[in-house]
Amino acid sequence: MSSSPSWVVLKFGGTSVSTAARWRCICEQIASHLAQDDATHVWVTISAMTQVTNKLTAALQQASRPVAGEPSHLELFRSIVLQHFALAYDVGLLPSLDGGLSSVDQHDRWQDKWLRSTLGDDGFAPVVIDAVLPTALHPLLLEFRNLYRILEGVKLTEEASPRIQARVLAFGELLSTHLGVCIMQHLGLSDVQRVDARQLLVSESSAAKSDEDRFLQAEVLPREDVARAVEASQRRRVVLTQGFIGSTKDGATCVLGRGGSDTSGSLFAAMLRAKRYEIWTDVHGMFTSDPRYVPDARLIKSLDYREAQELAAMGAKVLHPRCIEPAQFAQIPVEIRNTNDPNGEKTVIQPSRDQDSGSPKILAVVRRANMTTLSITAFDMCGTSGFLAKVFAPFERFGISVDLIATSQFSVTVTLDHIPGGVGGAPFKNLLRELEHDAHSKVQVFESCSVVSIVGRRLRKSLAELGRVFDVLEGYDVLLLSESAEDLNLSFVLQQKNADEIVARMHKYFFSAEDATAVQRSTAGTTSSIRRTSSRDSLLGPTWQTLRGSPH
């Protein structure tokens, strides 16, 4: 084995780690990487099994403030236990029991042993793990026990602080990796080490404005520390670790927020100076629009870091925008690949090559839903120094981040994505009170808004052609229009019920093959069009419909 391993980091999401078939694909991919040469090592970061994080969130709610008619925290806990049992059983981790039992009886007998080894007869009584259960599974069963005890503690105290919430939410990844390492060994990957991500990913507490930020939206700065990561790996060729979770400087568990597993994988890639970071999911990459609503959206084959970050921030859900920064920090290529089509098309994110000589290009039309818009009007604003500082001070004070901004002589309009506690929570109510009383402003609140964004490069160079997009908006109320300072997106805020239709019409304008042909005829020999540049077309792959119908 080489003394200087070359690392590849793979990240698999919840759907990719929830079935036996998907785990076989994961192990095949790992084996394929290992077969390249003796120096290649593989660092695997995985999420919780599908829906487990949602169940943990609901269990916290039901343990602290039960809602009548909803599953209890114990029922949700049992569902999580059985979900992991089903996977262990399907993979074949549980051997055949003696006694000539039918397959149904075998399953039921193992399920009973699994539950008894997790819960016992009394919530706080010591549990003896059934001796028939394989020893390799004992850490998983004990982790279930830890989760149950914490949920019972929440039930007794009737409260769950952000610190306790983070501890509970982290169990999804802790459980999936306990089971995952058993599956990998069972499927032939013997040289594998499970690593606790909390040993390596330590949050930057100085960035936290509140306990919610510190424990539930933790920030971990990218760094290179190959020696520490290799030490944690115990020099095994394969490492399995958790996405989403980390620790504070005093050793408490924290989580990186939803989508944090992408960021975890990127942080590990930077730490290891990996040669590549692969995000494995259930789609082929990033598309020119959300293919769930625009089936003829085309795959974007290549992006630079900033383009990918902007697409993710403005609505592309394939990856989290924060995951780009660590990869960019270490200049590591990122690939988005489909677990169901491992040798198929993909999106590659890499350093900018800027081969299009400064020409404008449109990359995608995307949207974000469930936004809140505030319009703040004050007639004493005009010409008043410090007015904007006064308006925005309460946002910082109550931990509410502003997304898009548009200003005039007498008003400021902003969009809000994440509001702690939602629009009915205390932070938002306090914000409105301060804006209306202390800033002497009239505040209008528009809920259920969507932001529709045209994402690209050097958009201002094609304002004349972009102006035709406004025809699509005729008859709709646009609450805000914003063009980014970096010239990367043009965004419109409107009521959510209209967003899907507008996105589809804008996408057709920019990416339809029929429209592109018409543009080529009408502009041939006179002008170029952002809808027919060769540099952009070379970046685009097949449509979603084509890829979905391709053989795997």
What does each model-found stretch correspond to?
Residues 2-319, 323-324, 493-495, 514, ...:
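Nucleotide/pyrophosphate-binding catalytic subdomain
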Residues 6-8, 40-44, 85, 191-193, ...:
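Structural motif
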Residues 49-50, 199, 283-285, 334, ...:
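Glycine-rich beta-alpha junction loops
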Residues 345-552:
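A conserved regulatory-domain signal marking ACT and ACT-like small-molecule sensing domains
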